[in-house]
């Protein structure tokens, strides 16, 4: 495998974490329940933070393609998180 190639194991791992975030954001069907859930912003944020930590801890040890994959998914997930959070209807309880 060249220094610029994308490891199928690494990319599958990253994409499985991305799918988990998508489930927590309510964007895709929960495979266990068979339906879309209401957004769980706490769980989604935790998974995004885990991906960010993975990026930080693997810095300098990934191929160029792996680095690009991680940067791109984090960028997209963070934007999506903000979008979902903006549309989150909060109930104000006095």
Task: Tell me the role of every PLM-derived stretch.
Residues 58:
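Acidic, glycine-enriched active-site microenvironments
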């Amino acid at each position: 495998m060249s220094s610029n190639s994308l490891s199928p194991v690494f990319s599958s791992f990253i994409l499985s974490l991305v799918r988990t975030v998508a489930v927590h954001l309510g964007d895709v069907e929960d495979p266990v329940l068979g339906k879309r859930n209401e957004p769980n912003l706490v769980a989604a944020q935790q998974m995004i933070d885990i991906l960010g930590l993975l990026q930080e801890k693997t810095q300098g040890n990934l191929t160029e393609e792996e680095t690009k994959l991680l940067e791109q998914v984090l960028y997209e997930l963070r934007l999506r998180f903000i979008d979902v959070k903006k549309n989150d209807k909060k109930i104000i309880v006095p």
